[in-house]
Each structure stands twice: as structure tokens, then as C-alpha cells.
């Protein structure tokens, strides 16, 4: 019996227009009415989730959201932080050094801000900030490492070819010290070592006394893989890559074909 539904957002809950289909909203409410806990698990920061949570009609209910690819978990009744992993000042210095050696730009997140280091934000950073409903805050390395802000996650953004080059040159080295993932063609993400959506979900499941066998997780991208494998039932979206699909227990329709609603109807309702 499924007791917890873990949902990725971009490419899963959201369609390509970055909207939540009504079929998804209806199915999610039906699952919650059956007693299933909803946990959105996303690479987005908290401020990039809030408007969608309100659209779901669940604002201030006692559910949970895992953001920043597992770096922080919030309880939605008051949006308090219940679990987190953060980057140290030396981590940030290391990430900054990698960005300086490449053509990608480093960004950082705390609970309230989308920070950009290394000068004016490039076009890809600007576009990403719009997607998460955020203004950009330019910050120096000295400010970023001052300890005044709790920095959860670093992201390197550039064109697809620039991000390819960054990944080829630095991913092997970076992943010895961080959890790194190419979440999108233009984004490479770095979290504290051992931090994924799955590790955050595992800790939350312990708090809620829910076994992994009672969890259904849905996603489409590389940063969803650990979560799909951790859950008792891991479902890949129809728009996922063949690689992600090969690691899932089942495949549903795409995010343009109400794939989340179809899976909820099949496995929960």
C-alpha cells in the first residue's frame, strides 16, 4: 500500500509550459484524501516551489517539500526548515575556483535568494531565475563565504556546449567532494557529498515512520534516479530518457499526457 507520493516537478508534475495540468491537481487531491502524504522533490529552491504549491490548493497543509535536490526539506504548514545539508565556506571557494577555470557561471542558493558569483549573470542564469520566480543577487566570494547565509547548493550554468566542457573536465574531480549531477543540458549541480533527493526522502520517511516499500516516486531526469531506485515503486515519465526509464520499475505517460494522474489512478486510487 502506497503511503507517500514523491513527485519531481519540472518534466513530471509540470507540463512543458511549466503549468500543472488540472488532471494532476485532481489526482493528487484524491490521493491525499486517501491518506497518502505528498512530497514534492525538486531541484528548485523553495521560492521556486511556493507559487505552484498554492496552485495545487495545498498551501499551509501539513505536507512536505524537498528542495535544492535534497539539500533542504520544509514542512508546508509553516514552511519551516526541518532538515538540511549545507555547503561550507571551503566548499564554496572550491566551486568558485572551478567556475573561474571554465566558461560556466556559479550560482548559489539560500532559503530566500538566488545568488550569482563572478560578475553579471549570463543569459542562461537570467532565464533560470525567471523560471523559479526569483530576482538575482550578485554576491562576491568574500560575501558568499562569510557564513552569514546558509548556502545549500551550487549550480554551474552555461550553454550546452559550455556545460559539456565543464562536465568533461571537472565532474570526476568534483564528485569526489560533492554530489554532482547534470540535471539539465545547461545546468550542472553540486550538493554536499552524499546529498540527493533520495537521501532527503529517506530521512523524511524515517521521521514519518514510512517504509521505502510504501513510497511511490515519479521523475524524468538524472537527478531523480536515486529517488526512483529508493522508492518501493519508482515510475519514470514517458518523456524521460531511455536510461532513466531503464532504471525505473514502471513507465507512465509523458508530462504532456497527464502521466502523473495516470500513475496515481493506476497505483494509488
Which sequence ranges carry the predicted segments?
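Mg2+-dependent phosphoryl-transfer enzymes with acidic/Ser/Thr/Gly-rich catalytic loops
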Residues: 1-4, 21, 189-269
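Asp-based phosphoryl-transfer active-site loop
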Residues: 3-17
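Short, flexible loop segments at the rims of nucleotide/cofactor-binding pockets, characterized by
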Residues: 14-18, 43, 84-85, 229
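Active-site phosphate-binding/coordination module
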Residues: 22-123
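Hydrophobic packing residues within well-ordered alpha-helices of enzyme cores
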Residues: 24, 49-53, 166, 170, ...
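Short active-site oxyanion
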Residues: 35-39, 61-63, 153, 213-214, ...
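Short, structured coil segments at secondary-structure junctions
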Residues: 56, 61, 69, 174-176, ...
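Conserved acidic, metal-coordinating active-site core of Asp-based
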Residues: 98, 102-218
Amino acid at each position: 500500500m502506497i503511503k507517500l507520493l514523491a513527485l519531481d516537478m519540472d518534466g513530471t508534475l509540470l507540463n512543458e509550459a511549466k503549468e500543472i495540468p488540472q488532471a494532476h491537481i485532481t489526482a493528487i487531491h484524491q490521493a491525499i484524501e486517501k491518506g497518502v502524504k505528498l512530497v514534492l522533490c525538486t531541484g528548485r529552491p523553495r521560492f521556486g516551489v511556493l507559487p505552484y504549491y498554492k496552485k495545487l490548493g495545498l498551501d499551509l497543509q501539513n505536507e512536505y517539500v524537498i528542495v535544492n535536490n535534497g539539500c533542504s526539506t520544509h514542512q508546508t504548514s509553516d514552511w519551516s526548515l526541518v532538515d538540511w545539508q549545507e555547503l561550507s565556506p571551503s566548499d564554496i571557494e572550491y566551486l568558485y575556483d572551478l567556475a573561474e577555470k571554465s566558461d560556466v557561471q556559479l550560482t548559489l542558493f539560500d532559503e530566500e535568494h538566488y545568488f550569482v558569483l563572478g560578475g553579471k549573470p549570463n543569459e542562461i542564469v537570467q532565464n533560470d531565475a525567471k523560471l523559479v520566480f526569483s530576482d538575482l543577487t550578485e554576491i562576491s566570494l568574500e560575501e558568499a563565504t562569510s557564513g552569514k547565509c546558509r548556502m545549500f547548493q551550487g549550480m554551474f550554468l552555461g550553454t550546452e556546449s559550455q556545460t559539456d566542457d565543464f562536465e568533461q573536465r571537472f565532474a570526476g574531480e568534483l564528485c569526489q567532494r560533492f554530489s554532482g549531477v547534470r540535471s539539465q543540458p545547461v545546468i550542472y549541480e553540486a550538493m554536499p557529498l552524499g546529498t540527493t533527493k533520495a537521501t532527503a526522502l529517506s530521512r523524511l520517511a524515517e521521521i514519518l515512520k514510512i517504509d521505502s516499500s510504501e513510497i511511490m516516486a515519479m521523475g524524468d531526469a538524472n537527478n531523480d534516479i536515486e529517488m526512483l531506485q529508493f522508492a518501493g515503486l519508482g515510475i519514470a515519465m514517458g518523456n524521460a530518457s531511455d536510461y532513466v526509464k531503464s532504471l525505473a520499475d514502471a513507465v507512465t505517460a509523458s508530462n504532456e499526457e497527464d502521466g502523473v494522474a495516470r500513475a496515481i489512478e493506476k497505483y494509488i486510487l
